[in-house]
Amino acid sequence: MIKLQNIKKEYRRKSIFESLDMTFEDKQLTILLGENGAGKSTLLRMISGLEDADRGNITYFGDQVAKKQLQDMIGYVPQDIALFEHMSVNENINCFKALCKNPITEDTIDQYASQLHLADRTVAVSKLSGGTKRKVNVLIGLLSNPQILILDEPTVGIDLKSRYDIHSLLNKMKAQCLIILTTHHLDEVEALADRIKVIGTDPFYRDVLKDKQWHFDTYNKQN
């Protein structure tokens, strides 16, 4: 479980969260919804240890964890594709794998690559389609065998087949780790979510989810 308590965060003197309390359960996939600027990416970066809260505590499985340890616990997949374009898929994998304390085995890499339909890993990233780059991005996030997997809009702007490949793998990964994901696609919510959390002040997502009779938790900057 990840537990956030009394989190305050400002960005450029603008309040994002005042006193946020939120929990994420292990072995579940939680989707964060909210308008642009609501703080979804900031929240993911705070949980990942990439940004500090101005106030409050975040605990992981009951403990406060140093940033160095978080690097070993968390697989973080940013919205921007974080790959070396001039290198092949395998070279990218080997480069990022070398940074992991306890990386997954080559057999597991092959298994994930197969599930993502990454057939030719000798191709330079620069020659890949946007959807294939996104799939490699997700695979890189799994190299450390993370207890927590965090994905910031991992399927934005890609084709339906690539989205399906990523969804299939994430649904299998739910049994192994805690997953947090942001998206703007309601079909992605339906395909993946065990829990739904809505942040921000725009009523759009709340109204749509109510119409669909889906259960969700709501948070605004005062929470």
PLM features: residue spans?
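Conserved ABC ATPase "signature" region
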Residues: 94, 104-121
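Catalytic Walker B motif of ABC-type/P-loop ATPase nucleotide-binding domains
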Residues: 149-153
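Conserved structural motif at the start of ABC-family nucleotide-binding domains
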Residues: 2, 17-19
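Conserved ABC transporter NBD signature motif
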Residues: 56-70
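Conserved H-loop
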Residues: 176-182
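Helix-to-loop junction immediately C-terminal to a conserved catalytic motif
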Residues: 48
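The feature captures the beta-strand-to-loop junction immediately N-terminal to the Walker
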Residues: 33-35
